[in-house]
Amino acid sequence: MTRAEVLERLRAHRPTLAERFGVVELALFGSFARDAATEASDVDILVRFDASPNWRDYFGAQFYLEDLLQRPVELATRDDVRAEMRPQVEREAVDV
């Protein structure tokens, strides 16, 4: 799967993610955002919810994305990203 394919799938399913899980922002980062993913790569996604997510929304969104992309997904809010990693993540993030 390529960066373009991941972005296309995420964009197509963004309304469902918003409706079912309260997702208001998505951004791709990591190896797929850099177009450097391998067969073993997971998909790194920054997410923002409309409210503080409960575990059903957070993990529901993660499992939905894993089914959609057929790969492991690392879902993170901006607050989850360690301070020393944040500048790199924000530089490479591709808004969906």
Task: Say what each PLM segment does.
Residues M1-E25, A33-E39, D50-V96:
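Catalytic core of pol beta-like nucleotidyltransferases
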Residues L46-R48:
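Short hydrophobic/aromatic beta-strand micro-patches
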Residues L28:
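Conserved histidines in hydrophobic membrane contexts and catalytic metal-binding motifs
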